[in-house]
Amino acid sequence: MATTPPHWTECRTELAARLGTVPRLLVATDFDGTLAPICPRPEDVQLPAAARKSLEALSNHPGVRVALLSGRELDNVRTLVHLPKLIYAGNHGLEIIGGGMDYVNPRSLDARPTLDDAARYLEEALAGIEGMLVEHKGLSLSLHYRLAPDNSAPRRDEAIASCATRFPGLKVHHGKMVAEFRPDVAWNKGFALKRLLKGLGLPAAAALYMGDDTTDEDAFAALNGLGTSLRVGPGAETGARYHLRDTDDTAEFLEWLKKLRVC
């Protein structure tokens, strides 16, 4: 893995050759931290107008499909973005709708009672700590602790470890100030991206994926070095080919891509 791949503006000619010549292109992207700045409270996040405008223009072009591959619940991210022609994949791809696809990972449905129990356990174990938020997303759980005091970390870590032990049917994944509990099934954003490509009849070379967190590395790897991958944010080891500084940079890249493909 490269520590920091080249910034996309250093590779415009290469990117134009990769993205401007394929007859049909899949533009797939994470949401929080990639398109929209992360907020302490997930419900406060909004899609910036510039990114929305570019995504809408790209999705209206017959040679482009746009997909959002988010850790959020599918209905939540679809409501936030509210662009009808997009493909939406929620819970890290455990559920997908759009582009002729209507998919829910069948094994993840069996985990719902366990997720209910795990959510109650975390809420009880962390009761009284201000800033701890347990978010039940139907097919997964997120424990957000961005707003919690630093001295709550030992109790938080103990609760996370204990929850993972008590509910072996769930697997814990750590992200940016969040611990996620997902059904322990062979599925991630990489598998979801491959399913999107198969459903659309596209090769990996016709795909672009952007993401900002460790969960996005599976999607980068799924492109097998053939597609175009961009990691958002500073200083992380990544398998992505290119680098975006932040969500503003993502908006600039999407504007450039819109001009390349649409205008």
Placement of each model-derived feature along the sequence:
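Mg2+-dependent phosphoryl-transfer enzymes with acidic/Ser/Thr/Gly-rich catalytic loops
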Residues: 2-8, 22, 190-263
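Active-site phosphate-binding/coordination module
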Residues: 16, 46-137
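Substrate-recognition/cap helix-loop segment adjacent to the acidic, metal-dependent catalytic center
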Residues: 72-89, 151-171
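Substrate-recognition "cap/lid" segment bordering the active-site pocket of phosphatases
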Residues: 91, 97-116, 173-204
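Charged, glycine-interspersed solvent-exposed loop segments at helix/strand-loop junctions
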Residues: 132-149, 171-182
